[in-house]
Amino acid sequence: QMVKSVYETKKRFDFIDMNFIGSIQARNDKIAGKLFDIYMTEYQRLNPKWSREELKPFVDKLVKEHIDKIKPASNTMAQSVFVEHPTDGLSLAASYVGGISINENYGSDYKSFTEIKENEVRIGHKPVGCGNVKATIDHELGHQIANKLNACNDTEIVEKYNRFSGLSDIEQANTLSTYAAKNIGEFVAECWSEYSNNPQCRNVAAFVSKRLIDLYEAEEIGPKILERGFSR
Protein backbone atom coordinates (compact mmCIF):
# COMPACT_ATOMS: atom_id res chain seq x y z
CA GLN A 1 0.00 0.00 0.00
CA MET A 2 2.91 2.35 0.65
CA VAL A 3 4.27 1.75 -2.85
CA LYS A 4 0.83 2.30 -4.37
CA SER A 5 0.35 5.55 -2.49
CA VAL A 6 3.75 6.97 -3.45
CA TYR A 7 3.36 5.85 -7.07
CA GLU A 8 -0.04 7.50 -7.47
CA THR A 9 1.12 10.74 -5.87
CA LYS A 10 4.33 10.90 -7.92
CA LYS A 11 2.19 10.41 -11.01
CA ARG A 12 0.15 13.47 -10.10
CA PHE A 13 2.89 15.60 -8.49
CA ASP A 14 6.19 14.77 -10.11
CA PHE A 15 8.10 17.24 -7.92
CA ILE A 16 7.68 15.07 -4.81
CA ASP A 17 11.20 14.03 -3.81
CA MET A 18 11.18 10.97 -1.58
CA ASN A 19 14.70 10.55 -0.26
CA PHE A 20 13.50 8.20 2.44
CA ILE A 21 10.60 5.78 2.84
CA GLY A 22 10.67 3.46 5.83
CA SER A 23 10.29 3.42 9.59
CA ILE A 24 10.62 6.49 11.80
CA GLN A 25 13.21 4.65 13.85
CA ALA A 26 15.38 3.87 10.80
CA ARG A 27 15.00 7.46 9.64
CA ASN A 28 16.19 8.74 13.01
CA ASP A 29 19.20 6.43 12.84
CA LYS A 30 20.14 8.02 9.52
CA ILE A 31 19.64 11.50 10.95
CA ALA A 32 21.87 10.56 13.89
CA GLY A 33 24.61 9.46 11.51
CA LYS A 34 24.43 12.70 9.55
CA LEU A 35 24.36 14.74 12.75
CA PHE A 36 27.46 12.98 14.02
CA ASP A 37 29.36 13.83 10.84
CA ILE A 38 28.17 17.45 10.89
CA TYR A 39 29.06 18.08 14.52
CA MET A 40 32.31 16.13 14.47
CA THR A 41 33.49 18.25 11.55
CA GLU A 42 32.58 21.42 13.43
CA TYR A 43 34.14 20.27 16.71
CA GLN A 44 37.37 19.35 14.92
CA ARG A 45 37.43 22.79 13.30
CA LEU A 46 36.98 24.51 16.66
CA ASN A 47 39.34 22.18 18.53
CA PRO A 48 42.15 21.32 16.10
CA LYS A 49 44.40 19.96 18.85
CA TRP A 50 41.86 17.40 20.01
CA SER A 51 41.72 13.94 18.44
CA ARG A 52 38.55 12.45 17.00
CA GLU A 53 38.48 9.95 19.86
CA GLU A 54 38.66 12.75 22.44
CA LEU A 55 35.84 14.66 20.78
CA LYS A 56 33.57 11.66 20.23
CA PRO A 57 31.92 11.61 23.71
CA PHE A 58 30.91 15.26 23.35
CA VAL A 59 29.55 14.74 19.84
CA ASP A 60 27.69 11.59 20.89
CA LYS A 61 26.04 13.50 23.75
CA LEU A 62 24.93 16.32 21.46
CA VAL A 63 23.56 13.92 18.85
CA LYS A 64 21.61 12.01 21.51
CA GLU A 65 20.05 15.24 22.79
CA HIS A 66 18.81 16.04 19.28
CA ILE A 67 17.53 12.54 18.53
CA ASP A 68 15.68 12.37 21.84
CA LYS A 69 13.71 15.43 20.73
CA ILE A 70 12.45 13.75 17.56
CA LYS A 71 11.59 10.33 18.94
CA PRO A 72 8.01 9.45 17.94
CA ALA A 73 5.34 9.82 20.60
CA SER A 74 3.57 6.65 21.66
CA ASN A 75 0.50 7.59 19.59
CA THR A 76 2.44 8.69 16.48
CA MET A 77 1.75 6.31 13.60
CA ALA A 78 3.49 8.14 10.75
CA GLN A 79 5.43 11.31 10.02
CA SER A 80 6.46 13.44 7.07
CA VAL A 81 9.82 15.22 6.81
CA PHE A 82 10.28 18.17 4.46
CA VAL A 83 13.24 20.54 4.84
CA GLU A 84 13.80 22.91 1.95
CA HIS A 85 16.01 25.46 3.72
CA PRO A 86 18.00 24.00 6.66
CA THR A 87 18.69 26.46 9.48
CA ASP A 88 20.71 24.35 11.92
CA GLY A 89 22.47 21.02 12.31
CA LEU A 90 19.32 19.00 12.95
CA SER A 91 17.39 20.40 10.01
CA LEU A 92 20.44 19.94 7.77
CA ALA A 93 20.71 16.29 8.80
CA ALA A 94 16.95 15.82 8.35
CA SER A 95 17.10 17.30 4.85
CA TYR A 96 18.89 14.15 3.68
CA VAL A 97 15.95 11.96 4.68
CA GLY A 98 13.00 13.97 3.43
CA GLY A 99 10.03 11.71 2.88
CA ILE A 100 7.55 9.66 4.88
CA SER A 101 7.99 7.23 7.73
CA ILE A 102 5.85 4.75 9.66
CA ASN A 103 6.32 4.11 13.37
CA GLU A 104 7.58 0.52 13.43
CA ASN A 105 5.69 -0.03 16.69
CA TYR A 106 2.53 0.13 14.57
CA GLY A 107 3.77 -0.79 11.11
CA SER A 108 5.06 -4.16 12.27
CA ASP A 109 1.48 -5.30 12.97
CA TYR A 110 -0.67 -4.72 9.88
CA LYS A 111 -3.85 -6.08 11.45
CA SER A 112 -3.58 -3.87 14.52
CA PHE A 113 -2.66 -0.84 12.39
CA THR A 114 -5.74 -1.32 10.22
CA GLU A 115 -8.03 -1.87 13.20
CA ILE A 116 -6.86 1.40 14.75
CA LYS A 117 -7.43 3.35 11.54
CA GLU A 118 -10.84 1.78 10.93
CA ASN A 119 -11.90 2.77 14.44
CA GLU A 120 -10.66 6.32 13.88
CA VAL A 121 -12.83 6.51 10.77
CA ARG A 122 -15.81 5.08 12.66
CA ILE A 123 -15.66 7.79 15.33
CA GLY A 124 -15.03 10.58 12.80
CA HIS A 125 -11.44 11.22 13.87
CA LYS A 126 -10.28 10.32 10.35
CA PRO A 127 -11.98 10.83 6.95
CA VAL A 128 -14.34 8.39 5.29
CA GLY A 129 -12.47 5.75 3.28
CA CYS A 130 -9.23 6.28 5.17
CA GLY A 131 -9.17 3.25 7.45
CA ASN A 132 -6.08 1.70 5.90
CA VAL A 133 -2.32 2.03 5.61
CA LYS A 134 -2.46 3.68 2.18
CA ALA A 135 -4.59 6.52 3.52
CA THR A 136 -2.06 7.13 6.29
CA ILE A 137 0.72 7.40 3.71
CA ASP A 138 -1.45 9.66 1.56
CA HIS A 139 -1.96 11.90 4.59
CA GLU A 140 1.81 12.27 5.01
CA LEU A 141 2.21 12.86 1.28
CA GLY A 142 -0.41 15.58 1.63
CA HIS A 143 1.99 17.37 3.98
CA GLN A 144 4.76 17.06 1.39
CA ILE A 145 2.54 18.52 -1.33
CA ALA A 146 1.28 21.35 0.87
CA ASN A 147 4.79 22.30 1.99
CA LYS A 148 6.15 22.38 -1.54
CA LEU A 149 3.25 24.51 -2.78
CA ASN A 150 3.03 26.71 0.35
CA ALA A 151 -0.62 25.70 0.31
CA CYS A 152 -1.22 26.50 3.98
CA ASN A 153 -0.88 30.18 3.11
CA ASP A 154 -3.18 30.04 0.10
CA THR A 155 -6.10 32.43 0.58
CA GLU A 156 -8.77 30.01 -0.63
CA ILE A 157 -7.53 27.12 1.50
CA VAL A 158 -7.14 29.35 4.57
CA GLU A 159 -10.71 30.58 4.15
CA LYS A 160 -12.00 27.02 3.83
CA TYR A 161 -10.07 25.96 6.94
CA ASN A 162 -11.32 28.90 8.99
CA ARG A 163 -14.92 27.99 8.20
CA PHE A 164 -14.26 24.34 8.95
CA SER A 165 -12.55 25.02 12.29
CA GLY A 166 -15.65 26.90 13.45
CA LEU A 167 -17.85 23.82 13.10
CA SER A 168 -18.84 21.55 15.97
CA ASP A 169 -17.06 18.21 16.39
CA ILE A 170 -19.99 16.36 14.85
CA GLU A 171 -20.11 18.75 11.90
CA GLN A 172 -16.35 18.41 11.40
CA ALA A 173 -16.65 14.61 11.38
CA ASN A 174 -19.49 14.74 8.88
CA THR A 175 -17.57 17.19 6.70
CA LEU A 176 -14.03 15.78 6.87
CA SER A 177 -12.64 14.64 10.26
CA THR A 178 -12.15 16.01 13.75
CA TYR A 179 -8.39 15.61 13.44
CA ALA A 180 -8.42 18.06 10.53
CA ALA A 181 -9.26 20.86 12.97
CA LYS A 182 -5.90 20.53 14.75
CA ASN A 183 -4.25 23.03 12.39
CA ILE A 184 -4.33 24.00 8.75
CA GLY A 185 -1.50 21.62 7.85
CA GLU A 186 -3.44 18.63 9.15
CA PHE A 187 -6.56 19.97 7.45
CA VAL A 188 -4.87 19.95 4.05
CA ALA A 189 -3.32 16.52 4.63
CA GLU A 190 -6.69 15.06 5.67
CA CYS A 191 -8.30 16.50 2.55
CA TRP A 192 -5.68 14.90 0.32
CA SER A 193 -6.03 11.58 2.11
CA GLU A 194 -9.79 11.46 1.59
CA TYR A 195 -9.49 12.65 -2.01
CA SER A 196 -7.08 9.80 -2.72
CA ASN A 197 -9.08 7.07 -1.00
CA ASN A 198 -12.80 7.87 -0.95
CA PRO A 199 -14.51 7.25 -4.32
CA GLN A 200 -17.36 9.46 -3.07
CA CYS A 201 -15.04 12.19 -1.86
CA ARG A 202 -16.89 14.89 0.05
CA ASN A 203 -16.98 18.56 -0.90
CA VAL A 204 -14.32 20.05 1.37
CA ALA A 205 -11.70 17.39 0.59
CA ALA A 206 -12.46 17.66 -3.12
CA PHE A 207 -12.24 21.46 -3.09
CA VAL A 208 -8.92 21.61 -1.23
CA SER A 209 -7.33 18.79 -3.23
CA LYS A 210 -8.34 20.31 -6.54
CA ARG A 211 -6.94 23.60 -5.28
CA LEU A 212 -3.61 21.83 -4.65
CA ILE A 213 -3.70 20.61 -8.24
CA ASP A 214 -4.45 24.13 -9.48
CA LEU A 215 -1.56 25.55 -7.45
CA TYR A 216 0.76 22.91 -8.86
CA GLU A 217 -0.29 23.59 -12.44
CA ALA A 218 0.13 27.34 -11.91
CA GLU A 219 3.63 26.89 -10.46
CA GLU A 220 4.82 24.95 -13.51
CA ILE A 221 7.37 23.14 -11.36
CA GLY A 222 6.90 19.82 -13.05
CA PRO A 223 5.01 17.89 -15.75
CA LYS A 224 1.31 18.70 -15.84
CA ILE A 225 -1.05 16.34 -14.10
CA LEU A 226 -2.62 13.87 -16.48
CA GLU A 227 -5.43 12.69 -14.23
CA ARG A 228 -7.53 13.99 -11.38
CA GLY A 229 -9.51 12.45 -8.62
CA PHE A 230 -9.77 8.94 -7.27
CA SER A 231 -7.82 6.18 -8.96
CA ARG A 232 -7.20 2.54 -8.15
Regions picked out by a protein language model, each given a short descriptive name:
Residues 1-231:
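Active-site-flanking segments in enzyme catalytic domains
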